[in-house]
Amino acid sequence: MARYRCCRSRSRCRRRRRRCYRRRRRCCRRRRRRRVCCRRYSRCRRR
């Protein structure tokens, strides 16, 4: 499964195989056919 890269805003997310490297950045996640940034950093690390 492809991993998501960290994004600055909730609406903008880019899909990459890298994990989130900063706590301030939000992780991108797929939600209802759309990519959204998750608020918790721990969730980004899991996927």
UniProtKB/Swiss-Prot annotation:
It is found in: Nucleus; Chromosome. Keywords: Chromosome, Developmental protein, Differentiation, DNA condensation, DNA-binding, Nucleosome core, Nucleus, Spermatogenesis. Signal peptide: none annotated. One of its GO terms (molecular function) is DNA binding. GO terms for cellular component: nucleosome; nucleus. It comes from the Eukaryota. One of its GO terms (biological process) is chromosome condensation. Testis. Its main location: nucleus. Protamines substitute for histones in the chromatin of sperm during the haploid phase of spermatogenesis. They compact sperm DNA into a highly condensed, stable and inactive complex. Belongs to the protamine P1 family. This is Sperm protamine P1. It comes from Myotis daubentonii. The lineage of its organism: Eukaryota, Metazoa, Chordata, Craniata, Vertebrata.
